Amino acid sequence: MEFVKSADVVVIGGGIVGTAVLRELSKYDLKCVLLEKEPDIAIGTTKANSAILHAGFDAPTGSLKAITNVRGNALYHELQNELDLDIKWTGSLVAATTDEEMQTLQELLQRGKKNGVEGLQILSKEEVLEQEPNLTTVKGALWAPSAGVCWPFGAAIAFAQCAVQNGAEVIRDCKVLGFVKEDGKITGVETNKGTIAAKYVVNAAGVYADEIAKLAGDDTFTITPRKGEYILFDKTACSSLVYGVVFPTPTKKSKGILVCTTTHGNTFIGPNANEQDSKEDKAVTTTGMNEIIASAKKLIPNLPMGAAITE
C-alpha cells in the first residue's frame, strides 16, 4: 500500500467539533491531519445553528451531555480570551406562559443545580420585563446567567488556524472513501486525494458520522437527519426585539422555537425540528415558516415580520 502522507491522528470532519479536536491534539508532539470533504471548513451544521453556549440545566443529571455541557461552557470563557472568539455572554431565559410551564421551570431549576449550573433563578413577570420588555405574555422565566451566544463559523476557523500554526494540516475537498486495515486495526484512510497512513482516526463527520463509521466496520448506530428552519431579521429595522437568548418552555421533542440576537446584532426566530431522509435538503418551506412565526408569537405577539430578511 502506497501512502501519500502519514499522520499520528487523522480527524475526519471540519466542523466545530473536528476543528476543536484538531486544535487540542496540535498542542502535543503529534502529526495531525484534518480531512474536510467540502471546499471549506465549517459550512455544514456549524454554519447553520442557533450558536448558543448553553448553561447546562436541560440535560439529564449525570449524563455525559450534562457533564460536558457545563464544562464546555466554562472552557469557552477561556477560549474566548485565548483565541479572541466572538462571544456575547447574554444569559438565557426560559419563558413560561402558563402555570403548568411555571412548574416545569421549577424542575429545570432543580436539575440545573444538580448539574452544577451556577446562578440559576426563577424570575417573576415583572423581573422578566425589566430584561426583555417585549415578552409581554410571560408569567415568569428561568434565568441562566452563564449562557451566551457565539459565532460558530468564526470559532471553527480560529480553532483550525491555531492548529495549523501549531503544525497541523487541513486538507479540503478531501472525501473519505474507506479505510485500510491490518489485523482488524485501521492503519490508513482512503480518500479521493490518496491514502493517508494513520495510527488513530477521529470521526467528527457530523450527520455523516454513521456512514464513516460503517466504512470502518461499525454499524452500531444510524443518524436520522433533523432539519431546522429559521427566520432572520434585519438588524437596522429590528435592533431591540430581544437582548439575549429566550427559550420557550421545552418539550420532549425539542427546546422549542426560540428568539435570540446573534453576535452580529441580527435577531432570529426558530428553529423548528423535522426529521427527514435527506442529509442535504436545506430547503425552507412555507409550512415551516408559518410554524416558526406562530410559535414565536406566543412569546412576542407583535413580531415585526416586515423586517424579516427574505433574500
Which positions does each model-derived feature cover?
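Beta1/beta-strand and adjacent pyrophosphate-binding region of the FAD-binding site
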Residues: 3-17, 33
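Glycine-rich FAD pyrophosphate-binding loop
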Residues: 26-47
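Short loop/edge segments at beta-strand edges and connector loops
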Residues: 36, 89, 124-125, 172-174, ...
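Dinucleotide-binding Rossmann-like beta1-alpha1 core, especially the glycine-rich loop
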Residues: 51-131, 256-257
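Short beta-strand to alpha-helix junction loop
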Residues: 60, 67, 95-104, 143-161, ...
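Helical element adjacent to the flavin cofactor pocket in flavoenzyme catalytic cores
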Residues: 142-200
